[in-house]
Amino acid sequence: MLVLVLGDLHIPHRCNSLPAKFKKLLVPGKIQHILCTGNLCTKESYDYLKTLAGDVHIVRGDFDENLNYPEQKVVTVGQFKIGLIHGHQVIPWGDMASLALLQRQFDVDILISGHTHKFEAFEHENKFYINPGSATGAYNALETNIIPSFVLMDIQASTVVTYVYQLIGDDVKVERIEYKKS
């Protein structure tokens, strides 16, 4: 089962669109679920995601126009409970102790958060944490040179194989990270 994880598009305020090389990789009919950390900013970005998969889950970012998106969400995909939050609520941004607290509050196997615009994936106390970064490479308050990235999770029974796609220069680099539920 393929799950696309992305966020912080900031279209059209900070970027015009997804990188063309990412659009070529993201084709309709291949992905079953989309988990988005927010800051899509417009309905057009949401409509684009709906063309890729029927099951789209979005949480509200601090720049989203649509106030109907929830602040947080817990989704079950296969054997995994996945928590989804934008991340502007985590202080300081990306703080491990704050993320671990949220993971325990949500009681999830995987916690997905964004806001920092920087990709991260790691295991902590037998739980898995993912920050997909910014799919467009949009700048943030602290940095202008952001590497565009998104994540594809391949969920098979009690294992998640995470593929990280990063646009470095003109090349899409892919890294593979495996997490087994204990």
From Swiss-Prot:
Subunit-structure text: Component of the commander complex consisting of the CCC subcomplex and the retriever subcomplex. Component of the heterotrimeric retriever complex formed by VPS26C, VPS29 and VPS35L; within the complex interacts with VPS35L. Component of the heterotrimeric retromer cargo-selective complex (CSC), also described as vacuolar protein sorting subcomplex (VPS) formed by VPS26 (VPS26A or VPS26B), VPS29 and VPS35. The CSC has a highly elongated structure with VPS26 and VPS29 binding independently at opposite distal ends of VPS35 as central platform.
Cited Pfam families: Metallophos_2
Function of the protein: Component of the commander complex that is essential for endosomal recycling of transmembrane cargos; the commander complex is composed of the CCC subcomplex and the retriever subcomplex. Component of the retriever complex, which is a heterotrimeric complex related to retromer cargo-selective complex (CSC) and essential for retromer-independent retrieval and recycling of numerous cargos such as integrin alpha-5/beta-1 (ITGA5:ITGB1). Component of the retromer cargo-selective complex (CSC).
Predominant place of localization: cytoplasm
Biological process terms in GO annotation: endocytic recycling; Golgi to vacuole transport; protein transport; retrograde transport, endosome to Golgi
Gene Ontology molecular function: metal ion binding
Protein name: Vacuolar protein sorting-associated protein 29
Gene Ontology CC annotations of this record: cytosol; endosome membrane; retromer complex; retromer, cargo-selective complex
CDD domains with a match to the protein in the record: MPP_Vps29 (cd07394)
Membrane topology classification: Peripheral membrane protein
Keywords of this entry: Acetylation, Cytoplasm, Endosome, Membrane, Metal-binding, Protein transport, Transport, Zinc
Protein family: Belongs to the VPS29 family.
N6-acetyllysine, modified sites: 50
Record localization: Cytoplasm; Membrane; Endosome membrane
Mutagenesis or variant effect for residue 152 to E: Disrupts interaction with ANKRD27
